[in-house]
Amino acid sequence: MPTSFYDVVVLGTRLEPLLCAALLAREGLRVLVLGQGVPEPSYSLAGVEIEPYGLTMAGAQSPIVQSTLEELALRQDVRQRMADRANVVQLLLPEHRLDVYPEADRWLAELGREFPGVRRQATDITRTLAEVRSEFDTVVARGLVWPPETFLERQRFSLTATAQRFDRQGQGWTSWNQLAVRHPLRTAFEAVLPHLSGLVPSQHSDSTRARLHAHVLSGVSDLSGGWSWFQEALFARIRSWGGDVRPRDRADSIRHDGRRGHSIHLARTDEEIGCSQIAHGTAIGELSQLLPERGSMATMFERVGEPRARAYRCSVHFLVEKRGIPDALGPLALRCMSETDPNQVFVLRSRDVESNRMLLSASRLVEEHLVDTGSSPLHFVREEALDAIRGVVPFFDEHAIWVDSPHDGLPPRAFRADTELPCSDPWARGPSTMRAVYDYPTRRALGVCALTTRTPVRGVFLCNEQVAPGLGLEGSFLTATSVAKIIGSQYRRRDWLRRGPWAQRSV
């Protein structure tokens, strides 16, 4: 028998499930959030807090992002913590360096300096990207369900998206297609796509490609405090509205009790909890393992296909002396190792740790066939990151203090003493901790969405990064608001019957 009951149980503590839980708790629903084995957002090494996966605010100006933050009373806090810098992101090519500015005239002047031969094409592309951003904002601001599944949802989505220059699959105008196929600028904008979204470049539609490129030109920022601060802020909002957060607990089974709801079993406390709705926020493969009949998800995979891992995200972190970093290197840079291959790319992030020290992080994608998540360390990850940084930071080895790569299975090492360093959470390391980037057989809703929010099990919803991987941060907000809208509408109908004119009738 269940010992407690909640309206909604949310599984996972990543961005999408936490946003959904906060929105539902704000509406008065009793919400329980379980960590479901999601690792901590940061770890400590030699007194320095490190986030393996940073939170890049690409698309923070989107109407859905701003309205959601406004509902959660976080808009002002996020605005104050967004890093304010003159240049948005740097493109570091083998023979060129560009600072991408949000002001069109400064950006075009930068292009004229590095690529004077394509200034006219770049001007047309920049103007068209601004128009696409405005058109897409009108669709996002309508509060639609992504992806639309019911008849009314599809009808409303089709009417809203009619004015778009893209078809239902998101095909139409291709961003930067006016340049030569192997032009360095086209390669750089193609290489940025997987680092701002959950799709590899070959899976992006024209609409998602143009939307992300417009986000890059309009502003990409980092949060002061990173994902660690944002996660704690969402925890605080959920608790303040009467919800409960248990980041160390996880459910090991879900039992469907028909119309009476669901019951979940907690592995650590051997507790059984009842609920009406479940929002699953980790990979869909983990949801299949929780259900008593794993074949129940087969109907969904027959309709939209089963995602398969295509690549993995990994990062390497260096503590260096601040005087060894060139002033021209910005806080966020895209380091392209080749002018023609968009796969050989590192994203460089830097932040001050002390007055004379700086943390420099390099993240990249590793193809699936190069990774064995269950065994041997990945020696090439650290070496290739060192080569990428040495190409932009002269005499890097003379100023480097230590290096750590939590995903390759190698211990952190000090450069000068050549010794291993102790770190917190040594068990949460290795190739198995890398996040996967999936390959999706089908995509829908202008190419933004891959999986559906509704699962074949009644009352169980999918609320993770696999629903709308095409837009990255903006897609996470679209997923969370869509699931919260679907679940909340059911309770609003019941509330109307309970409080409306029917409650005043007597038989």
Model-derived features: positions:
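C-terminal segments that line or cap access tunnels to active or ligand-binding sites in enzymes
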Residues: E321-D418
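Active-site/ligand-binding neighborhood in enzyme catalytic cores
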Residues: A130-W241, R248
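N-terminal glycine-rich phosphate/pyrophosphate-binding loop and immediately adjacent elements
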Residues: P2-D137
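A glycine-rich dinucleotide-binding beta-alpha-beta segment and adjacent secondary-structure elements
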Residues: R186-L199, F395-P469
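A conserved FAD-binding loop/helix module that cradles the flavin
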Residues: E465-G488
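Mid-domain catalytic core of redox enzymes
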Residues: L217, D222-L223, D252-N356, R454
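Active-site-proximal substrate-binding core of FAD-dependent oxidoreductases
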Residues: S489-V507
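Short loop/edge segments at beta-strand edges and connector loops
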Residues: G35, Q231, P247-D249, R255
